[in-house]
């Protein structure tokens, strides 16, 4: 009985391998560079001043880059 089950499992894996399953292209794991860029962007920091193009002087201590001093 176990050998028949093993043969059936082997045939199923040969006919439909697990790598043939299509992956969702919208997964963030598929694009790690974009995900990292979005996470560390200083423009998205709440202390970033878009008009001046830099962070407020006190936010340098809060790891907001670039600082204008």
UniProtKB/Swiss-Prot annotation:
UniProt main location, coarse: secreted
PTM comment text: Is not hydroxylated.
Taxonomy, superkingdom: Eukaryota
Location of this chain's protein in the cell: Secreted
Swiss-Prot/TrEMBL keywords: Amidation, Disulfide bond, Ion channel impairing toxin, Neurotoxin, Secreted, Signal, Toxin, Voltage-gated sodium channel impairing toxin
First and last residue of the signal peptide: 1-20
Propeptide positions: 21-52
GO MF: ion channel inhibitor activity; sodium channel regulator activity; toxin activity
GO CC annotations, alphabetized: extracellular region
A Pfam family that the UniProt record links to this protein: Conotoxin
Modified residues (Cysteine amide): 68
Tissue: Expressed by the venom duct.
Function: Mu-conotoxins block voltage-gated sodium channels (Nav).
Free-text domain note: The cysteine framework is III (CC-C-C-CC). Classified in the M-2 branch, since 2 residues stand between the fourth and the fifth cysteine residues.
Family indicated by similarity: Belongs to the conotoxin M family.
Name of the protein this chain belongs to: Mu-conotoxin-like Am3.3
């Amino acid at each position: 009985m176990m050998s028949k089950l093993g043969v059936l499992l082997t045939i199923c894996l040969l006919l439909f391998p697990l790598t043939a399953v299509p992956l969702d292209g919208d997964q963030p794991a598929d694009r790690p560079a974009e995900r990292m860029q979005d996470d560390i962007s200083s423009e998205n920091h709440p202390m970033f001043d878009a008009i001046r193009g830099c962070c407020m002087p006190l936010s340098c201590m809060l790891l907001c880059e670039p600082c204008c001093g």
